[in-house]
From Swiss-Prot:
One of its GO terms (biological process) is ribosome biogenesis. One of its GO terms (cellular component) is cytoplasm. Disulfide bonds: none annotated. GTP binds at residues 166-173, 191-195, 213-216, 283-286, 314-316. It is an enzyme of class 3 (hydrolase). Mg(2+) binds at S173, T193. This is GTPase Obg. It comes from the Bacteria.
């Protein structure tokens, strides 16, 4: 199936059902009190993460999604049925963004997690709600409010512990093949990798981590050169980045300039992503003698003014890959568990929340002030007198 990691859809929550104006009419009760019921709430639209999905391709062909409308209220104090909620299944790792405001509504990072993206309309109130000791035959009702409508941008971000960065042909795909069972395409031309790949690495029995390989970056990627930087978003959830550097580029380019270009593109895309822990990994060390290799590594590290971890590997010959995988496993295990709890202060305020609350408060205030605990509909029925 084709890998699609972005889609724009339109979601519409159901409108609330309107309240009903009705009066009790029975035999011998021709002028009964009000009995108009409330309408039903409109259905809301939710996104739900499902581990059985791995692409957003379905949303490319079906862009409009609408929840059910709430039913109107009816007589005899019958409340209308609430509209059925609409639940859209998306892959784990999906991020929902309001396309108009660019507001991030939330991230779905665990199987079964649900996210409200469009809130259903509030039900209208029937005339029963407006009866009081001074208003015996209210003809007021309220209409249901419209459901929320959103233009929604869905982004699929891969969930991985380790992300690979580097120029095209640096050996990223070869490395992921060496340490996992993933089989991305490998060839001797640039941009062999066109979509992200995931691999599960098992350095020790019962212990593993996930590694992500994305298409290579080149200088000017932020302006759209090459495949651009659209795939960098898949590294946002990684806990550590491996910067793969070709120690002996076949085209004669300077590894120092290539490394600086990658860091520059990373900072242009996201300073937060650029600040993630990053290790330098020199690949294709089998092309140099050991003395020459050591000298070249020291020179590059010095010119880059690099003070972090440095590793040398040959992904093709699988030299140093096992040791690097073990180091990564120990590092990831030493990190505190990720906190995916949503901060209440960061919760999205939906467009109709204030309206709903104000409407309720207004009705409740009137209702509480005027309502008589001893009020009885029968007190205001027509008195029937039988004469002989």
């Amino acid at each position: 199936m084709k890998f699609v990691d972005e889609a724009v859809i339109r979601v519409e929550a159901g409108d609330g059902g309107s309240g009903c104006v009705s009066f009790r009419r029975e035999k011998y009760v021709p002028d009964g009190g009000p009995d108009g019921g409330d309408g039903g709430d409109g259905g809301s639209v939710y996104l739900q993460a499902d581990e059985n999905f791995n692409t957003l391709i379905e949303f490319r062909f079906e862009r409009f999604h609408m929840a059910e409308r709430g039913e109107n209220g009816r007589g005899r104090d019958c409340t209308g049925h609430s509209g059925k909620d609409l639940i859209l299944k998306v892959p784990v790792g999906t991020r929902a963004i309001d396309h108009d405001t660019e507001e991030v509504l939330g991230d779905l990072t665990t199987h079964g997690q649900k996210l409200l993206v469009a809130k259903g309309g509030f039900h209208g109130l029937g005339n029963t709600r407006f009866k009081s000791s001074t208003n015996r035959a209210p003809r007021q009702k309220t209409l249901g409010t419209p459901g929320e409508v959103r233009s929604l941008k869905l982004e699929l971000l891969l969930l991985a512990d380790v992300g690979l960065l580097g120029m095209p042909n640096a050996g990223k795909s070869t490395f992921i093949r060496a340490v996992s069972r993933a089989t991305p395409k490998v060839a001797d031309y640039p941009f062999t990798t066109l979509v992200p790949n995931l691999g599960v690495v098992n350095p020790r029995p019962g212990q593993s981590f996930v590694i992500a390989d994305i298409p290579g970056l080149i200088e000017g990627a932020a302006e759209g050169a090459g495949l651009g930087i659209r795939f960098l978003k898949h590294l946002e959830r990684c806990r550590i980045l491996l910067h793969i550097i070709d120690i002996e580029p076949i085209d004669g380019t300077d590894p120092v300039e290539s490394a600086r270009a990658i860091v520059g593109e990373l900072e242009k895309y996201s300073p937060k992503l650029a600040s993630k822990p990053r290790w330098l990994v020199f690949n294709k060390t089998d092309l140099l003698l050991e003395e020459e290799l050591q000298e070249k590594v020291e020179r590059i590290v010095k010119e880059l003014e690099w003070e972090g971890d440095v590793y040398t590997i040959s992904a093709y010959n699988r030299e140093g890959t096992k040791e690097l995988a073990l180091k990564l496993l120990d590092y990831i295990a030493s990190l505190p568990p990720e906190d995916n709890v949503v901060n209440p202060d960061d919760e999205v305020e939906f467009k109709w929340d204030n309206y709903h609350q104000a409407n309720l408060d207004s009705v409740n205030e009137d209702y509480d002030d005027d309502f008589d605990d001893d009020f009885d509909d029968d007190d205001y029925d027509v008195e029937v007198i039988y004469q002989r």
